[in-house]
Structure formats: structure tokens, C-alpha cells
Amino acid sequence: AENKKKTDEKENLFPSLNFIYSLKENQNLRIAYSLTTARPSFKEASIAEIYDPLSNLFFIGNINIRPTYIDNFDIRYEAFGEKAQLLAFSAFYKNLTDPIEIGFVAASTSNYTPLNLENATVFGVELELRRSINSLFPSIRNLVLNFNGSYIISDEKYSEDEFKLRTLGLREGQTISNSRPLQGQSPYLINTGLDYNNQEKNVQIGLYFNVQGKTLEVVGDGFYPDVYTMPFNSLNFNLIKQFKGNRSLTFKITNLLNDERESRFEGFNNESQYFKLRNVGRLFSLGYAIRF
């Protein structure tokens, strides 16, 4: 017989409010509220059991997983300058209902699954800057500095079961609070870069760096330690040369620092151990394009 059951039949209304107050001709104050959702992926909202040969683990779906609903509150000050220069400062607060997290299946570190927790909060501040170097050093032309950085505090209350397991798993000298960081939420983000654009010579050059702080990847339970994603320092180079006849040459280098992507088990008074380690290496690419 045909199965006509839908996985999610709930109708949703997602209101949003935006207020913009012009402080000066080139300065704005923005205040916003919105309700958004983060729905589980097909893999998460299923009964699938998927083997990952890289980590030697099984991902087990959860057919009962619920969407996350997020109340977003934002305030932002922004000032604009010549040639698209920008200085902006923001503060934001998010309240998450039924946040989806990835945790180990009870009494096993070979299986992990998505779970809903009750509530979580996220508070953060953000600085955004786009500045022409020429305004600081007149002898340097066509060079622009871009910077975006965030500092974030997240708080997730333990479920009753998780708190009991973590309490039972306490070691001598170890204490426990009633909350922890939200799984998947980095404590800081940094994206910065230099863009050189010489229109006379039809050359664009970019050097970009981004990194995020140590992030809870898989939630443990006290007996099995939490898994954290370690910071990955990504430095990339990009060069584009335009020629006559709609032709262009592109040269890219990805991961100039040759950093590794790693995740680690971290327990109390224990040396961290690898959960996953991947040497992505440096990637060089050269391309030539003709537009018709």
C-alpha cells in the first residue's frame, strides 16, 4: 500500500521586524527581530544507519527529531565611507527551542545520533570593517582590508539524563555546572583578507584568512568524553588576470599554511586523543577561461 504519511505537516508563521534609524547621512542604527527555523536534514530525520569509513563510526538517524525554532534579536550600528568603506558593530541574541545536537548513543562511542534538547541561548558581538589602505597610507593604492570578527557565548542546559550521566562519571577533583556550550557553536570567528584590484592592468589579487574557535562537535555523557573540532587556520591566495577578448587566467592556492583538520576527545585531566584527523594538504589550481 502507498504510504502517504508526511514527516512534517505543521504550518509555520515566521514573522520579522526591521527598524532602521538614520543617525547621519552615512550612519544607520538597525534593530531587528525574526523567527526562523533549522529543520533536520533527511539523514537526521530518518531511520538510516550510515557507516563513515574515515571515523569508523555509524551515524544513526532519529525519526522523531523535531525542527529547531529560533528567536533572533539584533542591533547594528553602521557607518559608510567613500569607495564602499564600512565600519559596523553588531550585538545579537538568539533563543533556540528544541535545538538539534549530535551526541553519542548511550553506552557507545561507535554510534552517534541527532537529539533534541529543550532550550539554548546564544549571545554575541560582531565587528565588520572594510577599509581602503590608501586612506591610511597614501602611497599604497588599490588595496582594501576586509575584516569580520565575532565573539560568541552559548549556553545549553543539560537534559536530566545527560546531567545524571555526567554526575555519575565525575572524577576526583572534577566539578560540573548545570550547562555547557551549544554543540556546533564556535566561541569566535575571524574572517579577514586583503584585496588588490588594479583596473588599469586588469589584475585582482586576494589573500584571505579565516578561523573559528574550538567547537563542541559530538556531545559526550561523562563516561565518554566530548569531542571538539580544533581550530583550522585557513589561508588562501587568489589571482585573476583579465585579457582582451573576454579571456581570463586564474591561479589559486588553498590552505597555504598546510593546516590539518582535526577533532579530539577531551576529558578531565586526560591528554586529548584524536577522534578524526585529516591532512587536506595544499591545493594549487590554474584555470583559463574564454567567455563567448
Question: Whereabouts are the PLM-identified features?
Answer:
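Outer-membrane beta-barrel signature, preferentially recognizing the C-terminal barrel domain
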Residues: 8, 25, 37-96, 106-133, ...
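Repeated loop/turn-to-beta-strand initiation elements of outer-membrane beta-barrel proteins
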Residues: 26-29, 83-87, 136-138, 200-205, ...
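Extracellular loop and loop/strand-boundary signature of outer-membrane beta-barrel proteins
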Residues: 2-6, 58-63, 110-117, 175-181, ...
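C-terminal beta-signal and adjacent terminal beta-strands/loops
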Residues: 210-219, 240-292
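Signature of Gram-negative outer-membrane beta-barrel scaffolds
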Residues: 1-26, 50-51
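Gram-negative outer-membrane beta-barrel transporters
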Residues: 92-95, 113-215
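Residue-level signature of outer-membrane beta-barrel architecture
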Residues: 19-23, 35, 67, 79, ...
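Outer-membrane beta-barrel translocator domains and adjoining extracellular loop/strand segments
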Residues: 1, 42-48, 55-56, 99-106, ...
